[in-house]
């Protein structure tokens, strides 16, 4: 076999898209397995900038299959638009496959998302208002509409009527809002389904057939483990499982996963509300934000910035079974006189080594930092660790020591040729 899962080890935006694009060069199939179009990533390739939300990055390469698995919630309108934009950049999308079991995001999910978030007031979670949570709620409540339903006009009509009746009652009675029109949604979204019909199939069969043929399959997680609904900073999380969702969300058995690659930035960022122990609210945070262009791909919101938190990434390593590390954006820290790594927390005079479940407990913790000298040299052309200035190399080595995991790649810029490989993950799965 030859299967690799890529997961973010922080709160998303770690550069997973770049690493997925890089590692996908050795893959036959690239698959998403959770999340929705709330998870944007940017890929720089062939002199073009591709901004993807739903489509796996393998779609850029005609010899690869790109799979949207059953664990993904699909906004048909968003997906049709994304494919149209890719077509304008010369990407046909003919190699895309969409699970017939994937659930569909409809306009009432988006409206409900906005109303629920507004009703929370100061307790808002920081959702992207794209209907992800309400779609997963319908899935769990067993009233969701799947891609297979969207393609069947009678079934879609029947289920949409039932769902919209319930949602409109909620809009009017709970939120004092206006109801939505059935005909408008039905006609528009049925047509989206027809446009996507050519891509829809049982993707579990596609993936397992590829694995059984010993083809290299790359699974691409969205968001980050600290946004996992079970393992993240609940309730300030997403509605799916970036950490361990690959087997259920792709329809492959756990025994078929070979390596799990964790992606981290050399610092930490977060979009939206929720705990962030190493957050920087000073000029250092502003420096890193601007140097790293830290603004959301989907929302455009400025990301919150903090020092690298080894407690967070160790937690991610454990719960996701991470075997290898890709460290990105080291170049962003160039120009700082000093850099810090959070190695533990401290609460009431006691050292805390593991990330707590209780947000109250976490709010009482303070980060324990190791301070290292920074570097001023331009590192964007470095190809090996030895090419890095001593202080930058010491910083990278200290992170890997604290995490206890092998470094697979390190990146010193946004372009593919600025990602440097220490060991090829596909060689590891072939051993």
UniProtKB/Swiss-Prot annotation:
Keywords: Cytoplasm, GTP-binding, Ligase, Magnesium, Metal-binding, Nucleotide-binding, Purine biosynthesis
Assembly and binders: Homodimer.
Function field: Plays an important role in the de novo pathway of purine nucleotide biosynthesis. Catalyzes the first committed step in the biosynthesis of AMP from IMP.
EC number: 6.3.4.4
GO function terms (MF aspect): adenylosuccinate synthase activity; GTP binding; magnesium ion binding
Keyword Lipid biosynthesis in record: no
Catalytic activity: IMP + L-aspartate + GTP = N(6)-(1,2-dicarboxyethyl)-AMP + GDP + phosphate + 2 H(+)
Record: residues binding Mg(2+): 13, 40
Chief location category: cytoplasm
Residues annotated as binding substrate: 297-303
Residues where IMP binds: 13-16, 38-41, 128, 142, 223, 238, 301
Compartment(s) of residence: Cytoplasm
One family name in Pfam for this protein: Adenylsucc_synt
One GO biological process term: 'de novo' AMP biosynthetic process
Protein name: Adenylosuccinate synthetase
């Amino acid at each position: 076999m030859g299967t690799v899962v890529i997961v973010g080890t922080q709160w998303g935006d770690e550069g997973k898209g770049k690493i997925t694009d890089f590692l996908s060069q050795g893959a036959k199939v690239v698959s998403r397995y959770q999340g929705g179009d709330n998870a944007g990533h940017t890929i720089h390739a062939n002199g073009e900038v591709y901004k993807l939300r739903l489509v796996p990055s393998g779609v850029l390469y005609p010899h690869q299959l790109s799979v949207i698995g059953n664990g993904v919630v699909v906004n048909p309108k968003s997906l049709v638009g994304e494919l149209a934009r890719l077509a304008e950049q010369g990407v046909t999308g003919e190699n895309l496959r969409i699970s017939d079991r994937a659930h569909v995001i409809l306009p009432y999910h988006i409206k409900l998302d906005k109303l629920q978030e507004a009703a929370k007031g100061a307790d808002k979670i920081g959702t992207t208002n794209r209907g992800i949570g309400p779609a997963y709620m319908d899935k769990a409540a067993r009233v969701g509409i799947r891609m297979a339903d969207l393609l069947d006009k009678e079934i879609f009509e029947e289920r949409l009527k039932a769902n919209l009746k319930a949602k409109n009652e909620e809009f009017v009675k709970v939120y004092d809002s206006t109801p939505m029109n059935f005909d408008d949604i039905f006609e528009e979204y049925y047509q989206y389904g027809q446009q996507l019909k050519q891509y829809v199939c049982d993707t579990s069969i596609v993936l397992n057939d590829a694995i059984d043929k010993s083809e290299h399959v790359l699974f691409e997680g969205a968001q980050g483990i600290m946004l996992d609904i079970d393992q993240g900073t609940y309730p300030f999380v997403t509605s799916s499982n970036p950490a361990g969702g690959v087997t259920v969300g792709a329809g492959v058995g756990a025994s078929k996963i070979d390596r799990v690659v964790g992606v981290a930035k050399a610092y930490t960022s977060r979009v939206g509300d929720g705990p962030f122990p190493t957050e920087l609210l000073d000029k250092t945070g502003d420096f890193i934000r601007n140097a790293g262009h830290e603004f959301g791909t989907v929302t455009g919101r400025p990301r919150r910035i903090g020092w690298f938190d080894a407690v967070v990434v160790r937690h991610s390593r454990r719960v996701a079974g991470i075997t290898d590390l890709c460290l990105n954006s080291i170049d962003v820290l160039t120009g700082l006189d000093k850099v810090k790594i959070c190695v533990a927390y401290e609460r009431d005079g006691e050292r805390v080594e593991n990330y707590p479940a209780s947000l109250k407990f976490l709010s009482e913790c303070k980060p324990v930092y190791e301070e290292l000298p920074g570097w001023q040299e331009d590192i964007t052309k470095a190809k090996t660790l030895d090419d890095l200035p001593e202080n930058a190399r010491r910083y990278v080595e200290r992170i890997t020591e604290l995490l206890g995991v092998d470094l697979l790649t390190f990146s010193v810029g946004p372009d593919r040729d600025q990602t440097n490989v220490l060991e090829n993950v596909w060689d590891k799965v072939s051993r």
